[in-house]
């Protein structure tokens, strides 16, 4: 089911779970999540759950997409955001409607190619892609006002901290196995402030691109 009623049910659940940024909710409401999953799973697209997309990867739970987007935007509008882990392209599509420019890095080429096609279909033209290692970020185009990481890192990659602009916000899951925490890191005048925001579950952030 991909009816408007099904989408509204998801939005209601996100509100009940504490998502309050109206722009984020509006974008989640109008973004067709069923286009980002296999046809066989389309009937589950508006459930608040992660779903497999192949290559041992998942499309993130809508609540987590909303939560991470809300955290990124909490200090105001952003003009330049880097996403680590394009995956299906769903989080990318949401970001593209919330910020001025998105720079998305993915290590699995076939996933990135599919994501590109979906964003073209949705006429989202403010995203550029890099096929590469997410641990390295995209230093050539740094700094970024915001960075969002859609896979869990064993530690915060120094390269990503280095690419964060002053006042910039990094939203990243950190940990391993079943012990993972969502973190918000802000680049302050004299270093970084770190905020632990609760337990999460993500696939691991791996090294090295795969064709």
UniProtKB/Swiss-Prot annotation:
It comes from Pseudomonas savastanoi pv. phaseolicola (strain 1448A / Race 6) (Pseudomonas syringae pv. phaseolicola (strain 1448A / Race 6)). One of its GO terms (cellular component) is cytoplasm. It catalyses: [protein]-L-isoaspartate + S-adenosyl-L-methionine = [protein]-L-isoaspartate alpha-methyl ester + S-adenosyl-L-homocysteine. The keyword Cytoplasm applies. Its EC number is 2.1.1.77. Pfam families: PCMT. This is Protein-L-isoaspartate O-methyltransferase. Keywords: Cytoplasm, Methyltransferase, S-adenosyl-L-methionine, Transferase. GO terms for biological process: methylation; protein modification process; protein repair. Its main location: cytoplasm.
